[in-house]
């Protein structure tokens, strides 16, 4: 069975396999448009990039890059006027724009979820290095949950969360070997263990254990450590999510329960029309993958 993952985009879903990705979007005219692209992964060419932890860093970078490209295409379709040239909507971000968007996203995440909790904890009268790391971790998770709770209240994001749910349902149905029809897919769960929401929570949990080795550093070392150790922590979190995807037993699901619960904040029940879009993206990428050779790359989420 092909390893697949995806993400919600504007009025659509992006699905990816080891060697290809496809984005399907419901246009303002009501029809489904799809765009497909091959994935030229460095992990397929360099064995050392597939080593544990290292592969997690690479997978995260690739997922972010593909996600930005898919979002740009979906935004083009959403803004396209009736009768416009479809080729215009398929235009992607330039490499410079992609790098800029990547840096902005990473910078925002690091500032909000890494640096801010550290600085808040630094201002508290905590002398013990162990307690410092624990309190910082609790503040970090609290900020993350509050952030998800607040954005889930935004009306404009409701449809994005519905498409997120549609993505999960389609993948769950496919992995269960069921027929990919909206009425069938609708019966499946909104929750998936390899979801990026669960991955982010594990990044925060693992950070507590990693930072415990450094105690309570001075504020400038604190900021430097939180930034420089992020790739290592992300790589470790990837290994947890990867293991969970391969071993979905009761013990693993119990350990993953907090991350699965958080997905309730970022998914909503999709309509049959939205499931149709998600299924189209999945079918496109599966068809492309069936024509490709065996890949050494695994999909994160």
Which stretches of residues belong to each language-model region?
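Hydrophobic alpha-helical segments characteristic of transmembrane helices
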Residues: 77-154
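Divalent-cation
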Residues: 1-82
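Multi-pass alpha-helical transmembrane bundle typical of ion/small-solute transporters
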Residues: 39, 44-50, 60, 67-86, ...
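Alpha-helical transmembrane segments of polytopic integral membrane proteins
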Residues: 67-70, 74, 113, 117, ...
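Polar-ligand-bearing catalytic/cofactor-coordination segments
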Residues: 1-15, 19, 23, 84, ...
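Juxtamembrane "helix exit" motif at the C-terminal ends of alpha-helical transmembrane segments
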Residues: 73-77, 105-128, 203-225, 234, ...
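Juxtamembrane/disordered regions of integral membrane proteins
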Residues: 29, 83, 97, 131, ...
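Alpha-helical transmembrane segments of multi-pass membrane proteins, especially transporters
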Residues: 102, 106, 132, 136, ...
């Amino acid at each position: 069975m092909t390893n697949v993952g995806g993400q919600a985009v504007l009025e659509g879903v992006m699905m990816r396999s080891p060697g290809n990705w496809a984005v399907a979007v419901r246009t303002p005219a009501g029809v489904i448009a799809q765009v497909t692209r091959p994935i030229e992964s460095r992990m397929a060419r360099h064995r050392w990039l597939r080593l544990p932890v290292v592969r997690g860093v690479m997978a995260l970078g690739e997922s972010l890059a593909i996600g930005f490209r898919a979002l740009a295409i979906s935004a083009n379709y959403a803004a396209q006027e009736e009768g416009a040239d479809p080729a215009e909507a398929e235009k992607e971000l330039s490499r410079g724009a992609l790098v800029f968007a990547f840096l902005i996203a990473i910078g925002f995440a690091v500032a909000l979820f890494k640096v801010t909790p550290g600085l808040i904890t630094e201002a508290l009268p905590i002398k013990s290095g162990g307690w410092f790391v624990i309190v910082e971790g609790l503040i970090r998770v609290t900020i993350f949950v509050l952030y998800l709770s607040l954005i889930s209240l935004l009306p404009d994001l409701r449809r994005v969360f519905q498409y997120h749910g549609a993505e999960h349902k389609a993948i769950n149905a496919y992995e269960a070997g069921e027929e990919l029809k909206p009425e069938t897919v609708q019966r499946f769960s909104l929750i998936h263990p390899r979801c990026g929401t669960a991955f982010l929570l594990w990044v925060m949990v693992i950070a507590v254990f990693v930072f415990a080795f450094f105690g309570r550093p001075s504020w400038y070392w604190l900021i430097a450590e939180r930034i420089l150790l992020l790739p290592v922590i992300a790589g470790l979190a990837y290994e947890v999510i990867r293991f969970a995807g391969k071993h979905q037993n009761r013990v693993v699901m119990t350990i993953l329960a907090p991350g699965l619960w958080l997905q309730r904040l970022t998914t909503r029940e999709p309509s049959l029309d939205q499931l149709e879009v998600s299924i189209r993206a999945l079918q496109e990428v599966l068809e492309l993958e069936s024509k490709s050779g065996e890949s050494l790359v695994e999909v994160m989420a």
